[in-house]
Structures are given as C-alpha cells and as structure tokens.
Amino acid sequence: MAAVSFDEKVLAAKKIICDIEGTTSSISFVKDVLFPYALKHVEEYLKNHWSEDATKTVVAALREQADEDKKAEVEGVVTIPAGDSEDIIPDVVKNVEWQMSQDRKTGALKTLQGLVWAKGYKDGTIKGHVYEDVKKALEQWNESGRKVYIYSSGSVDAQKLLFEHSEQGDLIKYVAGYYDTKIGAKQEKNSYEAILKNIEATGEEALFLTDVVAEAKAAKDAGLNVVVLDRPGNAELSEEDRKEFTVISSFTDLPIESVKSTETENGAEKETVTESTEKVADESEKETETETAAAETENGAEAENGASKRKIDETAQDDEAQRPSKVVKVDQNGDSPAVDGAKQNGDSAEEPATLSETNGKSTGEDAMDVDAEMTDVESSSTTKAAEAGTGKVTEKTETEESPKEKETEMEAEAEVSKTDEKEDTKQQGESVTDGEDKKGDVINKNAEDDIKVEEEKNKEEESAPPTKKAKIEEDKMDVDEEDSAVIEKKADNVDEKPVESTTDEVAKKEENLVETPVDTAKPEVTTSEIAVTDETKEAPSDAAKEESVTSTSKTEEEKSDDLVPTTTSEQTVEKSSAEKTESKSEEETDSGTSEKKVEDKSANNEEEQKEPKESVVAEKKEEEIKVKTADEETKSMETDEVTVEKSNTKEVKDDNEQIPDSKADQDFNAKEAAKETVSEELEVKADAIVPADESKPKAQNDETKEKVTKAEEVTKTAETKTEEEEAKKTEEDAKKTEEDAKKTEKEVKKTDEEMPTEEIKMKDEPTVPEKSKSVDEPMATEESVATKEETLAEETSATTEAQATKEDEKPVDTKTNENDKTTPEVKATEEKTDDAKSTEVATATEEDKEMKEANSAEESVETKEKKTEETHTTDEDKPKESDVAKPDVVEKQEEKMETSEQVDETKGVEATTAGPVEEVAVEATEEDVAMEAESSDAVKEETKTEEPKSKVDKLDSEAMEVDSASTSQNEAKNESVKPAETAAVEESKTESDVVSTTSTDEVKENGTSEKVNTKEESRVPENGEADSKVTTNGNHDEKADSDKENDTSASNIEEASSATTTTTNGTSTESDSSSTTPSSETVAEIKSKKATDAVADSATPSVETES
C-alpha cells in the first residue's frame, strides 16, 4: 500500500473521536453477533425486567417513536398500545423486530439493545470484538497526551460494555468520554459541533475516525479533521471519496511519533505548558501559606490537611510534569490515564471536561467551573482558619511572654502528630466543661491514649521551665492574668492542652476517689463537674439534691480564696515541673519556695474538697437506704393485702359454685353463710386497711372498698341465679302437667269417636229384615267389609260424624204430605220404614249428643254447607270431594236413610190401580231403590272395594226376581233385565278407577229416545223441568218437590254419585237436576222410578235393599 500523506493538522490533533462499527470493531460482529442476540433475548428480557424503571422508560420511548412514525406515515410501522401491563410485550417485540429489519438507528431501539446485550456481556456469552491495532493505538495516544472519545449510534451503555468486555481485555480506561445519538445524528453537522463544545476543542484540534463517508462529510462540514477507515467487510469507497478524505486501513498507519515531535516543537503547546505550571505554582504558594497558618492553630483536622497539602506541593515543585492533586480528582471519575497524559503535555486547562463527557450532554465549562470552585473553597476555608488560629496563637504568646521560639515549634509538631487524639479529647473536654459527660466516657479510653498523654506531659514539662522562670521573676499578678487568659481560651475551645490534662486528671480522680493524688490538682471546673455527676447519679430525694448543691457551693467558696492552684491544669503542669527543677538547680530557690506554697495550698484544698464529698456521699447512701426500706415496707403491705383479697375471693367463688347445686331447703343456709363470709372479709380488710392508710394514699383504700363491693355483688348474683333456676323448674313442671292433660284429653276423644261407630253398627243390624238364604250371603260380605273399614272409621275426625248426623236429620224433616193416595200395599211398606226411621233417629240423636260433647258439630256443619255450595257450581269436582270427605261407615248410614226417604216419597207418586200408570208408579219406587244401590256402589268404588259392590247388585237383582215371581208379565221383564244388569256390573268393575260408570245402553240427553233392551221409550223431561206422573184419574202431578229432595239428598252424600249413570233392570235414564247441566243424579232418579214397575205387584217392598 502506498504511503499516505497526512496533513499537519491531523497529526497535531489533541482530541481523537472514534466510531465503533467498521472502525474499532468489525461490522460482522455487530450484525452477526449483537443483533441476533438482541432479537433472540429481547422478549425474555422484557418479561424478567418488566417492573424495572429502565425497562418502563425504554418502552415509553419506543411507543413515542412509533407514534411519530405513524404520523409521518412510515410504511410498515408497528405501534405499541398504551398501558403498563405485560400484555403489550408482544407488540414491543414486533416493533423492535421491525426497526431492526429496517436497520434503524433510533435512540430507543439502541437503548433497549444495550440493556439486552448487558446480560450477554456479564455472563460471558458475548465478548466485544476489537481489532488488534486498537489497543496499541489507544495506549500510545494516551501516552502522548491525547484524549480519545467514542461516538457511535449504539447507546453509551452498550459502548462501555463492548470496551469493558472486549477480546483484548478492559479498554475502558483509555476512553475519556462516550457519545451516542442523544447528542445528535451522526450524519448531521450540528452533532459534531455539539461534541466540540462539550470537549472544549476547536475543529482543527479534533480528529474524527469513521468508515462511513456521509458521517465523514458531516464532521468535515463542522470543521473537524477526518480520516476514513477501510476495514475488511466495510463498504467500498469510491475514487472520489478517496481523493476527498485520507483513507487508512489500521490505526497503526497514523504516525504517532511525529505527533509527539510536533507537540514539543509547537510554540502554542509550550505556552499552554507554561501557563499551567504558573497556575500550579500559584496554587502551591497559597497552599503553603495556609499550611503554615494551620500548623500554628490547635485545630487538628486543619493541621493534618495542611501537612498533607504541604507534602503534595513539595512533590509538585520537584516534578512539574506530574500533578497528583488534580490527577486524583479526575481518577475518581474513571479518566485518570487520559488526564495523566494531558497533564504531561500541558493540558491542565482542559482536563476537567472528562468529568461530564460520559453522558454526552454536560459541557466541559461546567466541569471546569466546578473544579475551580472546589479549589477556591478549600483555599478560603484554610486561610480563614489560619487567620483565626494565628490570632489566637499570637495572643497566647503575648500573655505568656515566652522568649523562646522552640516552644511553639514543639507544640506545632506535637499537634500535627496527635490530631486524631486531639479530636477525641476535644469532644470529651467540651462535654466535661458543660457538665454533660459522665464517668463512663472517660473510663472507656484506650491504653494508647494514656501513653500519648504521658508523652505530651513530658514535652510540656520540657518546654514549661523557661516560661515559669519568667513568670515567677515578675509578679503573682502576672500569673493571675495568665490564668484568666487561659480560662478564656479554654471557653473558646482553642487551647487543648489544659483540656487534655483536666480530662486525664478527672479520669484518675474518679477511678480513685478514696486516694489523694499529689501531682494533679483539681481545677474549679472539675470540682463543680464532679458535683453535677453526683447529682445525676445519686438523686433519689429532694433532700439529697439540696445537700449536693450546698456541697458544690462550699467547695467553690473555699476555692475562691486562692485562685492560683485552682484555675487551670496548666498551672498544675507548672507545679509538677517546678518540683523537678528544685531538685536539679539551686538557683531557682525563690521559684521553688513559691511553688511549694502553691502545692501546700492545693493539697489543703483537695483535702477540704474530699471531706465534704465523702460526708455527702455517706448522707446520700443513708437516705437511699431509708427510702429503699420504706418502699419495701409498702410493697410488702400491698402484697399482703392482695393475698388476703385473693383468698377471700376464692372462698366467695367456692360458695357461689355450691349454691346452684344445693337444694331449695339449703338455699337459705347458703345465703346466710355467704353473708357471714362477706362480713368477715370486710372485717379482715378493715384491719388490713389501717396500716395501709399510714403509708399509702386514700386511693388504695378506695380500691379495697371497690373489691369488697364486687365480692358482695358476686354473692347477690349467685342468689338471683338460684331463684331464677327455681322459677324455671316450676314453669317446666307446669308445662309437663299441661302436656299430660292434653294427651289424656286426646285419648278420651279417640275412645269417644270409636264408641259411636260401634253403636251405629249394632243398631244398623236389626233394621235389615230377614230374607231368604240367598240374601244372607251378601250381608255377610258386607259385614266383613265393615270390619275392614273400622280402622278407617277410627281415623275420621269429629267433623265427619257431625256431617253424618245432620244429613240423617234432613230426610226426616223433608217429608211431603202427598200420602193421601196410597194403596194398602204401600202402607205396609210405610209402617216398616217408619220403624227403621225411628231407630235411625234414635241413633242420630245419641250421636248428636256425643258430638256436642266434643264441641265440633258447629264447625262440621259450616264446612259441610260450604262444600255443598261448591258442589252445585262445579260438578266436575264432586267425585274428588267425596273421596276425601266421606268414610265408608258414614256413607252406609246415609244410604240406609236415603232408601227410607225414597220409599216415603213413592207414597204420593205410585198409582193405586193396575195398568200402565201403575207401572210408572212402581218404576218410581224402583228408581229410588236403584239410586240407593248406585250410591253404595259408587262409594265402594271410591274406596276400592269393588267386590262387595258387585255382590250388593246381585242381591238387588235376586230380590227383584223374588218380587216379580207372582206375575208372569214382570217375569219376562226381569229375565230380559238380568243379562243387561250383569253386563252393567262387569263394566262398573272394569271402570272402578273412574267415578262414573255407564251401561251398555246409550244415554241421550234432553229427552231424546234411549234404548232399553233394544226397545225405544219416549222421554220428555228437559233440564230443570219436573217429571210429570199420571195418576189413576188421568191427572198429572209434578214431582218437582220430590226431585228436589232427591237432589239435595244426593248432594248431601258428598256428591259421591255425581256424574254417574247406573243401570237398574237394564234401563238407563236421565233425571232433572238442580244444577244448570243435566247430572247423573236425575238419571238415577228416573231409573229408580222405572224399577218400581217391576216391584209393584210384589208383596215385599223395596226396603229390603237397604243394606
């Protein structure tokens, strides 16, 4: 490769700005390693770090960028919805993938990439690629005094990670600052101008290294020197680009040595070096001045700082090229290597810029101002302290009038070597003067402090004699003036030597209170301090406090007589030194005699001080003992009272526990015992209260009284509980008796209910007339059925029996007067029915009486009337009501009564002569009898006793055959009826679940013709009309009354046979009904009328079918 010619400005550049991708690192590393890693782990990073502030910030920035792209109508932009939930993570990932596919360089994208890459760098999966020539170049540039900056599209964090975790090690120490796209885009001129301002350099002083021509042009426009890198894998450069810019393939192509020579030969550089040295010299002079002033002061911290600064300045004067004071400051910000190089080349004015260049935003001017302010503040503070310290030192020397300068030098050296010790002792001395520190603070000193104090004393003793001589030769007044001056200094916390001596002496004094040290004399401050500490430690009563105060006042008065030995510890030091000088030299006899007098006085004062202290301590101890004994006595009294109270309360509780368990006879005795215990407790507590009143306030007596009242309340509550329990027991006994009475009443009612049913059965049996053997068998079956139904009769209520009695009474009262036209045969039947009625009425009256005793007849009557009204309106519900309300026994009773009524009704209906009219009359009686049989059949079907019903029907048919045997005409009719009757009975068995039964004949309503044994008979009655009957005279009598009676009687049977059409003698008819629609009851009436035709000629009436 041909040699490259460089412009002098390029070689003279002091600030080098480098790109990363294609310049310091390969493009393939970014595209093949970093980008794929970011795409692969971005989602994982977002999920694991979603709650972190950095993640939230970068996501918000990505959202804003997407919104801007959408407004700019960027093709394919992927927006991110608002919100902080993790549901938007997939949208964020899509946005990142879209931007990376477009090779975008947005700040938000680069920031997120840097966060993702950080994980890879830290765990070692990623190592930053750097060309081999980069590390060498960075080292050489730093050694030559140049500063290196990085400007890349990647984030600052990513840049640092790459150089920190590079393949060639940690290179971050060679970089002075980092800039990313936050300062501006790399292809814009303004970005480079901003960087120049930040690093405080001109365009001619800066060099920009890049691989992108567009970036090079922008930097050139900003006035920077530019060199283009042609690395492997970079974009090819055109001939025009090569002509316009200097092109190199490695950093080693830059002539670093020539850069060094140009710097040394450049006059401008020399001027900057001289300026910097002059500044350093000025600063060093100021620091030496402050150091000397601080050395004379007694402030340990300032003296230490001054000494250190003096050493630093001395080293700076020896070697101007190295300035560690400022190098140290810059090193704290990570820019030490660059700063060192800059200082070696006289670059001190620009070095603070590195403090704020890492973020790419702050300016170097601000950094320099801050550094300058720091130095000014330090110098001002040291000078002020030095002035104050020098003023005090001069004041001290004037009062002491020491002719020697060695004393001050010795003191300064001692102060510098003991700065740490003085800080601790200063704080302790201040606390001692204020009277706040106590014994523990002084005792906790280390053995090292004691050794140092002894060394200080030796030094002070060596320096003290000449001053003492001068003082003793003059006058005692001078000594008093010196003491007063020292006291003032001590108040201002300037002189620390007396403080140290006093603290040491205080510690020794407190450790050995009994012994009397000779060498140390207690000053006035320390004696008052001891009194204060005694007050704080031992102050149990007011009397003790007063005594302690008086003791301190006495000691102060005694000390006021002689100020010389009691003012300061400095005087005590002089005393000890004076004793030594007496043994050494005879020339100081005068001073020795004076010092002996002073010592005698101090010893006397110490003895006088200790005597009142010991007396005070003894008095305090005695008082404390008295107070403690009094407290113990009071506590013992309290405990005795508490134990007595506890024992009494336990006794009361035991009594209360026994009271509920005792019987009624022992309640009175228990109450009296409780009262006695309470009275005894009161007496015991009264005895206990008497001594308590002597040592305790009235509040304790009130508490004992309250406890006694509580005990009384406990006994009262126990008594009330026993009374309440007794009342509860009596109430429970009364309830039990009431329940027993109710049970007996219920049992009596049940027996009463069972008795009438048995009596009814007994009375019903004789009413049935004796018949032939064929009739006895059905009766037996009926009796068996009745016995089975007795169990059901027992469960019936009193209301059903009352209903039965009323229904029995009604037919008796509803007799018509149409009995004038009767035949002798009908009269015979009438007599028999009357007998049956009388027996039935008798039974009814007896039942009525029994039911009145049960007080339920009225309620049953009311319920019956309501039911009858309902049945007239709704015929369809009649079968259901009859099923629920009627028991079998009562229904049998009603059937018997109805047969008797129907026979009576036939008296005014039957014809007295033979013929067709006679047949009609007989049919009427037959229909009544058939109706009775039908009602019994219907009731039996409801109770699911179909077998007895069929037998009753057969019984009726046999009776009809016997009655019709006398006439041949009726025999023919009966023979024709039997097959139809048997067919009807069979049909009724098959349709037992249904309430109504139908015969083989068809029933036609509204008077239409109907078939009876294949014969037609004309019918006239309409709904609501009365049946007309033809008498012997040919007149027509209306049977409206009788029909109505039949209707009412049928409804009183709980409508058991409502909507039923039964057959008798093979005929099926319709009868009038009181309801609006034709019912089965009217049909049954007409059938019974026709049945009387077949029975008219027979000698026996139809009463035989009552059963």
Curated annotation (Swiss-Prot):
Sorted alphabetically, which keywords does the UniProt record give? Answer: Amino-acid biosynthesis, Cytoplasm, Hydrolase, Magnesium, Metal-binding, Methionine biosynthesis, Nucleus
* Chief location of this protein within or outside the cell: cytoplasm
- Regions of compositional bias (Low complexity) in chain numbering: 291-306, 794-803, 909-919, 1048-1083
Chain segments carrying region Disordered: 258-1107
Q: Does the keyword Metal-binding apply?
A: yes
User: What is the main EC category here?
Assistant: hydrolase
Q: Does the keyword Magnesium apply?
A: yes
Question: What does the Swiss-Prot or TrEMBL cofactor note state?
Answer: Binds 1 Mg(2+) ion per subunit.
Question: Which residues of this UniProt protein bind substrate?
Answer: 152-153, 186
* The name this protein goes by in its record: Enolase-phosphatase E1
Q: Which organism is it from?
A: Aedes aegypti
